[in-house]
Curated annotation (Swiss-Prot):
Protein name (record): Probable cytosol aminopeptidase
Cofactor note: Binds 2 manganese ions per subunit.
Gene designation per UniProt: pepA
Keyword entries, A-Z: Aminopeptidase, Cytoplasm, Hydrolase, Manganese, Metal-binding, Protease
Reaction equations catalysed: Release of an N-terminal amino acid, Xaa-|-Yaa-, in which Xaa is preferably Leu, but may be other amino acids including Pro although not Arg or Lys, and Yaa may be Pro. Amino acid amides and methyl esters are also readily hydrolyzed, but rates on arylamides are exceedingly low; Release of an N-terminal amino acid, preferentially leucine, but not glutamic or aspartic acids
Active site: K272, R346
Coiled coil start-end: none
Assigned EC number: 3.4.11.1, 3.4.11.10
Localization, UniProt: Cytoplasm
Binding sites annotated in the UniProt record for Mn(2+) 2: K260, D265, D283, E344
Pfam families, A to Z: Peptidase_M17, Peptidase_M17_N
The species this protein was found in: Clostridium perfringens (strain SM101 / Type A)
One Gene Ontology term of the molecular function aspect: metalloaminopeptidase activity
Length: 493
């Protein structure tokens, strides 16, 4: 856990001194440190290349201090995301040195500005320090690290502003890690009922209303599509509705965040392989994303109205489970031919979207889902595939993503693609064939948005990682939380 303070404390009083360093000459007022850096640079032990880390130990009057040099490369090439990644790497060095207090020598990067530089540094450290070890019997106690942020360029009158920037960065990191925790919980502990209970606790903490509908209430709402997916499990489905009204003068404007909430997905009778099932606790990554986003929005008291909806269930096999060849209904009244029970997420989402529009009066929709393997094939592990019916809405998302470093890419949605999901014996079929799988899955949901401005975010790539990143460990990443928050935040300015 990292705590952050802005103050004019002495840099010699901490266990470590963290110095961001560009390849070009970095101005460091302390002559002793400058001399040490010049020596190691002459010996070519450290150049300041991007991501390079070098440690020097020095003795002060009453302390032995580690000086961590963090290479940022060329200043002309630095970005907010590069800063985040570099500081995420620095966490490993701080951990290796067992530092409990760190002085971060802060200088604003002129091209990025004070706010963005500071925010990226804090997010890199806070997100990079995340770990999920609650099930390890020999887990080490979490070390609390205090980061003192200072520098000769921080003016006295800027301290309060810097503290506000840090507060926002810490909150976004916290709610991103909240989403990571939800995804990382094993499915034997995180099933629809326990997820609903957890969301109630989260709502109490962050300041939003939560209402949970049980299976009988869901049936009364005629959400047959959602219920069909969960029929094979003994863990009964739950519809989780979160409400935050920060702009009560404009109650007709309500942004709905709809997250896919498959707490486990075996594929049903269209069964996945064992390897394909191992990580399927992560199939509620969309739900985790919208829960994290509304938590941050509510805690910051943004002037916006947000509804978050999660249709939580498990897709398993039993004598009650739905089958390929079935025809099912939906809350919107449309019928669906089931060709593949592993194309289940879209079936839960369409009822959740219909609920958001008809019962919660949503004026705009963003659905977030770990929906298709095709998104991974087309865009890789780090990019969110996006379908929209309004390019201006996508433009908002794209601008927000530039701020957060979470990559998004708009997929085509030509009218011809919609023909691929038409059924001969029902209104629609739940899979469009082997081509354009990400697009047809998104357009299937688009059939239910009732002409509302809509974004579909397929986070199948970035939501769960099997390799460690610079500021994200293996497992749930919390993809989408910061970008959804940023989109909402920009509307309030």
């Amino acid at each position: 856990m990292y705590n952050f303070l802005v103050k004019k404390s002495k840099c010699t009083e901490t266990d470590a001194l963290l110095i961001p360093y560009f390849e070009e000459k970095t101005n460091i007022p302390n002559q002793e440190i400058n001399n040490k850096i010049n020596i190691i640079k002459k010996k070519e032990q450290f150049k300041g290349s991007y991501g390079e880390i070098f440690n020097i130990t020095r003795t002060t009057e009453d302390n032995i201090q580690d000086i961590i040099l963090l290479g940022l490369g060329k200043e002309t090439e630095i970005t907010k995301e590069k800063i985040r990644r570099a500081f995420g790497k620095a966490v490993n060095e701080i951990k290796r040195l067992k530092s409990k207090s760190v002085f971060l020598r802060f200088d604003s990067v002129e091209a990025i500005g004070l706010e963005n530089t500071l925010k990226a540094m804090v997010e890199g450290l806070a997100l990079g320090s995340y770990s999920f070890n609650k099930y390890k019997s020999d887990k080490k106690e979490e070390v609390e690290v205090t980061v003192h942020i200072g520098g000769h360029n921080i003016k006295e009158e800027e301290i309060e502003f810097c503290e506000k920037v840090i507060d926002e960065a810490v909150l976004l990191s916290e709610t991103t890690c909240l989403a990571r925790d939800l995804v990382n919980e094993p499915a034997n502990n995180m099933y629809p009922e326990t997820l609903a209970k957890e969301v109630k606790n989260i709502g109490s903490k962050y300041g939003f209303e939560v209402e949970v509908f049980d299976e009988n209430q869901i049936e009364e709402l005629k959400m047959e599509s959602f219920l069909s997916v969960g029929k094979g499990s003994d863990n009964l489905p739950r519809l989780i509705v979160m409400r935050y009204f920060g702009d009560k003068d404009n109650m007709d404007q309500r942004l709905a965040l709809v997250g896919k909430g498959l707490t486990y997905d075996s594929g049903g009778y269209s069964l996945k392989t064992n390897a394909g099932m191992v990580t399927m606790k992560s199939d509620m990554g969309g739900a985790a994303s919208v829960i994290g986003a509304i938590s941050a929005i509510a805690k910051r008291n943004l002037k916006i109205n947000v509804i978050a909806v999660v249709a939580a269930c498990e897709n398993l096999i039993s004598g009650h489970a739905y089958k390929p060849g079935d025809i099912i209904g939906s809350m919107a009244g449309k019928t669906i031919e089931i060709l593949n029970t592993d194309a289940e997420g879209r079936l839960t989402l369409i009822d959740a979207v219909t609920y958001a529009i008809e019962k919660e009066k949503a004026s705009e929709i963003i659905d977030v889902a770990t929906l298709t393997g095709a998104a991974l094939v087309s865009l890789g592990e780090d990019v969110t595939a996006v379908i929209t019916n309004k390019d201006e809405f996508y433009g908002e998302l794209r601008e927000a993503s530039y701020e957060t470093g979470e990559k998004v890419w708009q997929m085509p949605s030509f009218e011809d693609y919609s023909k691929l999901i038409k059924s001969n014996i029902a209104d629609l079929k739940n899979i469009g064939g082997k081509y354009a799988g990400t697009i047809t899955a998104g357009l299937f949901i688009g059939e239910f948005v009732q002409n509302k401005p809509w974004l579909h975010l397929d986070i199948a790539g970035p939501a769960f990682s099997e390799k460690k990143g610079d500021y994200c460990p293996t497992g749930g990443t919390g993809a989408g939380v910061r970008t959804l928050y940023e989109l909402a935040n920009r509307r309030c300015k």
